[in-house]
Structure formats: structure tokens, C-alpha cells
């Protein structure tokens, strides 16, 4: 499993500033976005591909509100007119429309940069229901590979489907044993 770059739990502005000061590059567990671009279908599908690629790999964080150059964080860029609840609802609707199966466990963490200014960290867990496909004419199965996303190879896809079936079978066996042990 890949270690997270940002701390678990509440994320403070100091953690985001340390990404810049420490010259932390985008990688297997983190991606930087200066804005939340969901203005057109191409932008929505690109963001969905990022989410699915993290879920299909080891999970990770997408940080909205950090400018990057050459894959390295360069500056905090507060999100303009940020309404956390509205943005979360919009993003969840987009993800549920374009990713199958839905990615469980997404967390949206608002980070106050200054009075009235915010960034957003989208925490994507490694999914137990992977592989996740982008819905299109031909479904695509992206996976995070270092600081980029790429399509899953056929062998990897077979392995993930097999692992998913194995997890479902183990959960079913656990429930049967739990029910059998009840008085």
C-alpha cells in the first residue's frame, strides 16, 4: 500500500503549505488542481478518470486549490466563491453518473486557507469494489501509475475482478459464520 502524503484526519492549511515548501511532487497518492473544473463533459470525464484511477490503485488525494508546475505544488490558490456542500453534491452526482460501480468512501475535506478562503481535499480510498470503469461507448478502466493514470492491462483487469469476487465471497462466508454463531 502506498503511504498517503497528507495526514489522516483533519487537514489544516499547514499541511498544504508543507507540500509546497517540501517540493512534494504529484505521484501515486496525490494530485494537484488549482481549480475545480467541471465546466464541460471533457473536464468532468478527466476528473472522473482521476478518481477511478486512484480507487483502482492504492487510493490517494486530489487537492483543489494548489497551483502546480511540472507536477510540483507551487502556491496555494483559494477556490473562488467556494460553497463546500454545493460542490460536494455536484461532484458526487458527476462521479455517480460517470463511474461504475460507484466509488465507496469518498471524503471531502474543506481546508480553510484564510478567512473566507478555502481549498478542498478529495480523499479517495483504495476501493474494495474495484475495478471501476469510466462509462462511455467503450468502458475504460484507469489506474494510477506514479504521477499519471493509464488504462489497466487485461491481466490486471482479470486480477482485479478476481480479487473483487474473492472479497465478496469472504464477506458472505463471514456473515454465514456470524449468523451460525448466534444463539
Which positions does each model-derived feature cover?
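Conserved N-terminal catalytic/coupling substructures associated with nucleotide/phosphate chemistry
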Residues: 1-183
Amino acid at each position: 500500500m502506498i503511504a498517503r502524503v497528507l495526514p489522516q484526519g483533519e487537514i489544516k492549511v499547514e499541511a498544504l503549505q508543507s507540500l509546497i515548501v517540501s517540493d512534494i511532487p504529484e505521484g501515486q497518492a496525490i494530485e494537484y488542481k488549482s481549480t475545480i473544473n467541471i465546466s464541460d463533459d471533457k473536464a468532468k470525464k478527466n476528473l472522473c478518470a482521476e478518481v477511478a484511477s486512484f480507487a483502482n490503485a492504492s487510493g490517494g488525494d486530489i487537492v483543489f486549490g494548489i497551483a502546480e508546475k511540472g507536477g510540483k505544488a507551487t502556491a496555494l490558490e483559494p477556490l473562488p466563491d467556494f460553497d463546500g456542500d454545493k460542490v460536494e453534491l455536484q461532484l458526487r452526482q458527476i462521479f455517480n453518473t460517470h463511474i461504475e460501480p460507484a466509488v465507496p468512501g469518498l471524503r471531502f475535506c474543506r481546508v480553510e486557507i484564510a478567512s473566507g478562503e478555502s481549498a478542498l481535499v478529495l480523499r479517495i480510498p483504495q476501493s474494495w469494489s474495484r475495478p471501476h470503469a469510466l462509462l462511455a461507448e467503450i468502458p475504460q478502466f484507469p489506474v494510477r501509475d506514479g504521477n499519471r493514470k493509464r488504462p489497466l492491462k487485461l491481466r490486471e483487469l482479470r486480477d482485479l475482478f478476481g480479487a473483487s469476487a474473492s472479497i465478496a465471497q469472504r464477506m458472505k462466508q463471514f456473515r454465514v459464520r456470524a449468523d451460525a454463531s448466534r444463539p
